[in-house]
Amino acid sequence: MNTVFNGKDFANKYYLILKEFLKQHDLRDKIALKVVLANNEPASKLYVSIKNRVAKEIGLNVEVIKFSANSVQSDILEVIDRENKNLSTDGIIVQLPLLRHMDSNSILNSIVYSKDVDGLSFVNLGKMILGDKKGFIPCTALAVLKILLDEGIRTSGKTVVVVGRSPLVGKPISILLSSKPYDATVIVCHSKSIYLDVYLRQADIVISAVGKPKLIDKSMLCGEPYVIDIGISEIETDNGKILSGDTDFDNIKDCVKFITPVKGGIGPVTVLMLMFNTIKAHLINNNMFDILDRLEKLVEV
């Protein structure tokens, strides 16, 4: 029977585990996450509100720091510098995209790596490549690993086609899955790959994150692969705008073993991994490594 993944139920199960973990170790309301919001896009505001709600539900303190369209880059850098030095701040994230006149690399890399719980700084990306467990893996990549593990989808010796090469998603996933202990043979494709269908037909697992609606249909797949669809786009229909993934979901759902939908798929698990990383940051920065071991056993990745 083909499986359509339910990310909401998956994440809710672990939210209860994290909530109880914080209660048991007297950590409720003692871990602080700062969220920088510097754009006016409705989607970004929605994502921030979800992160804020979930964090508060499990027992984290959250502050959303908003910047107007008139803000300049130095305004954000000043706030990040302040929070880097603030001993009560455990994690700092910047909701992307930023305002057009701002350089995201400069801003992301201004966050001290020990508080970069989105795992997007050069330091944390380097730690990920080297397998340093004190670093932070980007949350979406971590969500993919968590889904594969919990759903019993073996990667060792399997062919994984990753469609997308962004530093936020595609590159981290391809690096991680080709490393120990995942040991997959990874083929990286992207929106300009000429023979995408040829590579996809070799795949045991397909992970797509390019943001091109309905790029992948059943004619491009072979042998009922597992599919994790991270891409999200808006498309026009006769009934107005709807969300679409990189896959033509209705077209392929019956010819794959497993698939994540656009709504309630990878998104809730990505938020879960942000909560995990934030708690991890607090434990590392306070030398609470015995408690960190317990956390990592509860939320195995």
Curated annotation (Swiss-Prot):
Gene3D superfamilies: Leucine Dehydrogenase, chain A, domain 1, NAD(P)-binding Rossmann-like Domain
Pfam families linked to this entry: THF_DHG_CYH (PF00763), THF_DHG_CYH_C (PF02882)
GO-annotated biological processes: L-histidine biosynthetic process; methionine biosynthetic process; purine nucleotide biosynthetic process; tetrahydrofolate interconversion
The protein's role, per its UniProt record: Catalyzes the oxidation of 5,10-methylenetetrahydrofolate to 5,10-methenyltetrahydrofolate and then the hydrolysis of 5,10-methenyltetrahydrofolate to 10-formyltetrahydrofolate.
Name the record gives this protein: Bifunctional protein FolD
InterPro entries in the cross-refs: Aminoacid_DH-like_N_sf, NAD(P)-bd_dom_sf, THF_DH/CycHdrlase, THF_DH/CycHdrlase_cat_dom, THF_DH/CycHdrlase_NAD-bd_dom
Keyword terms: Amino-acid biosynthesis, Histidine biosynthesis, Hydrolase, Methionine biosynthesis, Multifunctional enzyme, NADP, One-carbon metabolism, Oxidoreductase, Purine biosynthesis
Reactions catalysed: (6R)-5,10-methylene-5,6,7,8-tetrahydrofolate + NADP(+) = (6R)-5,10-methenyltetrahydrofolate + NADPH; (6R)-5,10-methenyltetrahydrofolate + H2O = (6R)-10-formyltetrahydrofolate + H(+)
Gene Ontology cellular component terms for the protein in this record: cytosol
PANTHER family the record matches: C-1-TETRAHYDROFOLATE SYNTHASE, CYTOPLASMIC (PTHR48099:SF5), C-1-TETRAHYDROFOLATE SYNTHASE, CYTOPLASMIC-RELATED (PTHR48099)
Subunit structure: Homodimer.
UniProt-recorded Gene Ontology molecular function terms: methenyltetrahydrofolate cyclohydrolase activity; methylenetetrahydrofolate dehydrogenase (NADP+) activity
Positions contributing to NADP(+) binding: G164, R165, S166, S191, I232
Enzyme Commission code: 1.5.1.5, 3.5.4.9
Domain of life: Bacteria
Biological pathway: One-carbon metabolism; tetrahydrofolate interconversion
Family: Belongs to the tetrahydrofolate dehydrogenase/cyclohydrolase family.
